[in-house]
């Protein structure tokens, strides 16, 4: 346990449709610390790209909203997912499932507009080939959907500049434990995918 964040627990539980279950969750709040308890229910679906493409057969253009989530990147987070460690990212690639689906959409002849939601830079080199347009939306907040729609429908010209450098791949910015900046980052790089201020 940490004074900043408790260890997250994940319990898998099989439930049958129509049955009632009594679930009890117990927790203890320490003096002078706030308790933060969340309870999520869901299930994982197998990915069937062809079934998705079949549903989109009459669509010329697909707006794909993807990226990563603030549940994956942050500080001192108990994340045990490939590509992430303690809230830090060990690689900067787009998750493989999304990358593969964007490629499948392009191969199916779709025009693809990718709205990328992330709190930091993502290596989007393959997406510059599989997507016809990329809109960086960051984590947009409650009015974000309307703001993105206004851009997509031409009511507003996206005029922002990138506050960070987007690298081509993880090799340009590998996971490191030595925080010396000499020879690293955008200050020493001439071939970033999207440089600072793009």
Where are the model-predicted features located?
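C-terminal non-catalytic regions of proteins with extracellular/luminal or membrane-system context
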Residues: 1-198
